[in-house]
Amino acid sequence: MAEEQARHVKNGLECIRALKAEPIGSLAIGEAMAAWSEISDNPGQEQATCKEEEAGASGLSKPCLSAIGSTEGGAPRIRGQGSGESDDDTETLGFPSRNLQASSTGLQCYYVYDHSGEAVKGIQDADSIMVQSGLDGDSTLSGGDNESENSDVDIGEPDTEGYAITDRGPAPISMGFRASDVETAEGGEIHELLRLQSRGNNFPKLGKTLNVPPPPDPGRASTSETPIKKGHRREISLIWDGDRVFIDRWCNPMCSKVTLGTIRARCTCGECPRVCEQCRTDTGVDTRIWYHNLPEIPE
C-alpha cells in the first residue's frame, strides 16, 4: 500500500517540476479549471479511461499522464472530456492555440484509481493526491473548483507571474495518508523506542548502588555515655652494639605523647591503670634482656 502511494506521489512531483520548468499562462489555467469544473458538475458524462496493464493485488492501477497543449493543431487536449466525439487518446477542448506554447510540456492531468476501480482525475500537485485507506466503493476523490469538503487542496486565483496560488491545509488522517505520512509515523515510533531505551540505561543497577551515609549532626554530642577506658601502650627498644642485642619492653600510658624516640612516660590524666593486663603476665617488662646471637631472639 505504501509503495503504491509513494509511486503516485513521485508521479505528481514530476508534474510539478514540469510546471515549474515551463509555467503556463494564467488564462489557460483558468479555462482548464473551468472545463474541469463542468466535468465535476456532470457526473453522468463519459468517464475518462486510459490504456494500462491489469492492476496488481493491491487494486490500484498505474497512473496515466496526459499533457495539455502538447501536440496536434496547437490546441490543448485533455482526457475524459467531450459530449460524444472522442478518440482513444485525447479530446480537443477548443482552446485558442495562442494561450499555450506548442513546445511546452504543459499542465498535466493526473489519474488515480481507487479501490473500486473508478478513475479519479485532477489537475493538482502531489500533496493533494490521497488514496483512501478503506475499501468502500463509494469513497472517491474529486478535484478542481468543486472539491469535496474532505479535500486538502484549494486552488486560488493565479498571480501576476502565471503561477497558481495554492493553499494547502492539513490533510485529515482519518480519511487517508500519504507515503510521507507513513515514513513519519515509522520514524516517530523509532524515536520513541530509542528514548525509552536511553531512559532504561540511566536506572541504577541492583547491587552496585553506592549508599553514602548522611553527614553527622553537629547538634549531637561527640562523646559517648561510656568514657574510653585508659590503658597502656607497649613500647619496645632494640639496641645492638655489634656483639649483642639488647631488648627493653615497657608500657607507656595512653595519655602520653607519641614521639620518634623511645621514652618512658608517666600518666598525666590520672585515669590510666598503674599496671595493665599485658604487663602483669609479661615477665620481661622493665627487665633488660640481651641475646648473644640473633637466632636466639624469640618471634
Curated annotation (Swiss-Prot):
Record has Metal-binding as a keyword: yes
Biased composition (Acidic residues): 146-160
A molecular function (GO) term: metal ion binding
Binding site for Zn(2+) 2: 255, 267, 269, 272
Subcellular location: Host cytoplasm
Annotated Pfam families: Paramyxo_P_V_N, zf-Paramyx-P
Keywords annotated in UniProt: Host cytoplasm, Host-virus interaction, Inhibition of host innate immune response by virus, Inhibition of host interferon signaling pathway by virus, Inhibition of host IRF7 by virus, Inhibition of host MDA5 by virus, Inhibition of host RLR pathway by virus, Inhibition of host STAT2 by virus, Interferon antiviral system evasion, Metal-binding, Viral immunoevasion, Zinc
Superkingdom to which the source organism belongs: Viruses
Purpose: Plays an essential role in the inhibition of host immune response. Prevents the establishment of cellular antiviral state by blocking interferon-alpha/beta (IFN-alpha/beta) production and signaling pathway. Interacts with host IFIH1/MDA5 and DHX58/LGP2 to inhibit the transduction pathway involved in the activation of IFN-beta promoter, thus protecting the virus against cell antiviral state. Blocks the type I interferon signaling pathway by interacting with host TYK2 and thereby inhibiting downstream STAT1 and STAT2 phosphorylation.
Descriptive protein name: Non-structural protein V
Organism: Measles virus (strain IP-3-Ca) (MeV)
Lineage of origin: Viruses, Riboviria, Orthornavirae, Negarnaviricota, Haploviricotina
